[in-house]
Swiss-Prot record:
Pathway: Carbohydrate degradation; glycolysis; pyruvate from D-glyceraldehyde 3-phosphate: step 2/5. This is Phosphoglycerate kinase. SUPFAM superfamilies: Phosphoglycerate kinase. It catalyses: (2R)-3-phosphoglycerate + ATP = (2R)-3-phospho-glyceroyl phosphate + ADP. It comes from Stenotrophomonas maltophilia (strain R551-3). GO terms for biological process: gluconeogenesis; glycolytic process. It is found in: Cytoplasm. Keywords: ATP-binding, Cytoplasm, Glycolysis, Kinase, Nucleotide-binding, Transferase. PANTHER family: PHOSPHOGLYCERATE KINASE (PTHR11406), PHOSPHOGLYCERATE KINASE 1, CHLOROPLASTIC-RELATED (PTHR11406:SF23). HAMAP family: Phosphoglyc_kinase. It holds the Pfam family PGK.
Length: 391
């Protein structure tokens, strides 16, 4: 890729518009997780230290275009940024036609999704964004898969368009995991449905040496292998698809190991009685809610021997203590492994937090949908636009 990096530019005296992902959860006007704000700070500080006139924007929620609403305002974000940076960060409304900002100053531009034309990547709006700055910096990997005016259109028209440190770190880590991975490459893909991860499974099966499936996805593969899954969540209409994925893996020498034992319950409840069973001993009224200890040990061994691990999804109902042991075993194995590891997806990050292994994971992707689309081999609009500008 030939993307211009913000870190290679001299921003002194330049008007710099930075698209961040500051879409933080807010309840009753209070920010409940400020991870995305703190992640953006090094980028903002670097631009300020170089003497740039810094404008930052982000989306928050899904406001109606053309309508300002307090619920979707970045006001709480501006306040928190002011506290973290130790300087006033003014929030600017109605900013599309011009922003008054001086070198060494930083302003936050109100929720870009309130601007008419943002969602449809409107060309006229994109040109107005571009006219605000000398340099546009795309630093919001979490929205890189959306072709919108602030993530795509502006890149086409800004005098200079660059990838920010957060975005580039994400792309560098993903490239290390997928383009030239240390072998063996092991992927863990889990979730409730094969249908939502079908493209991901099909893409990864052409790249990985081992593919561990978990959750409802694993149940479909277990059923495809001819075992009873009882009342477990699975997709009977995708059994042939699961068989094909297994066959495709085998054809290129890759392996999709199935659980040898599982943890079952009669009800989907936090206090349900958990019972470990061999995979061929699941009863008609059983729910499979986790992998069993033997399987967890086998998978942990694969992780220990891996050169690269890509983790997307917990392998059991880890929110329920009795059914969290499988996910914990894999999390601990990733933490102690020497492999280059990358973890992404909301539930995965919750598991990383629950088992307190963030410091031991090589790279934690905050991308969500963009992370999945990249793993699926899709071209991300923002990345493609930056690449075209850098060519």
């Amino acid at each position: 890729m030939s993307i211009v990096r913000m870190t290679d530019l001299d921003l002194s005296g330049k008007r710099v518009l930075i698209r961040q992902d500051l879409n933080v959860p807010i309840e009753n006007g209070r920010i409940t997780s400020e991870q995305r704000i703190t992640a953006s700070l090094p980028t903002l500080k670097r631009a300020l230290e170089q003497g740039a006139a810094v404008m930052v924007t982000s989306h928050l929620g899904r406001p109606k275009e053309g309508v300002w609403s307090e619920a979707d305002s970045l006001a709480p974000v501006a306040q928190r940024l002011s506290e973290l940076l130790g300087r006033e960060v003014p929030l600017v409304r109605d900013w599309v036609d011009g922003v008054d900002v001086q070198p060494g100053q930083l302003v936050l531009l109100e929720n870009c999704r309130m601007n008419v034309g943002e969602g449809k990547d409107d060309e006229a709006l994109s040109k107005k964004y571009a006219a605000l700055c000398d340099v546009f910096v795309m630093d919001a990997f979490g929205t890189a898969h959306r072709a919108q005016a602030s993530t795509h259109g502006v890149i086409r028209f800004a005098p200079v368009a660059a990838g920010g440190p957060l975005l580039m770190a994400e792309l560098d880590a993903l490239a290390q995991a997928l383009d030239a991975p240390a072998k063996p490459l092991l992927a863990i893909v889990a979730g409730s449905k094969v249908s939502t991860k079908l493209e991901l499974l099909a893409s990864l099966v052409g790249k990985v040496d081992q593919l561990i499936v978990g959750g409802g996805i694993a149940n479909t593969f277990i059923a495809a292998a001819g075992y009873n899954v009882g009342k477990s969540l699975y997709e009977p209409d995708l059994l042939d698809t699961a068989k094909k994925i297994v066959a495709d893996a085998k054809a290129r020498g890759a392996d999709i190991p199935l659980p040898v034992d599982v943890v079952t319950a009669k009800q989907f409840l936090p206090d349900a009685v958990a019972e470990v069973k061999a995979v061929d001993a699941v009863a008609e009224d059983d729910l499979i809610l986790d992998i069993g200890p033997q399987t967890a040990a086998q998978y942990a061994q694969l992780i220990e021997n891996a050169g690269t691990v890509v983790w997307n999804g917990p392998v059991g109902v880890f929110e329920f203590e009795a059914f969290s042991k499988g996910t914990e075993a894999l999390a601990r194995a990733i933490a102690s492994s020497n492999a280059f590891s990358i973890a992404g997806g909301g539930d995965t990050l919750a598991a990383v937090d629950k088992f307190d292994i963030a410091a031991q994971v090589s790279y934690i992707s905050t991308g969500g949908g963009a992370f999945l689309e990249f793993l699926e081999g899709k071209t991300l609009p923002a990345v493609a636009a930056l690449d075209a500008r850098g060519a």
